[in-house]
């Protein structure tokens, strides 16, 4: 949704906001962080398969991926502008869900202590 929106939304001399470097940087950051989180999850899966997964690994995974998911959702909301808080786009629901996940999966403070 966010990428498509940035391609369609026009601003400043009737150019899509996706053509602006600040928007491109946010999109690049988001996909990079999402990919890093996926790689971390894959590595933890491999460690589990090998019987080498430790609680600290799980805490690193949860702490990192929940924080990144929250930041990606916030940046996505920013890219959507005023529409980011409208029901038409589900980003606010995702943000609320992620805040819940941050709590029930253990706060980052608890995970830091485990690590």
Regions from the language model: what does each represent?
Residues 1-115:
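Alpha-helical interface subdomain recognition
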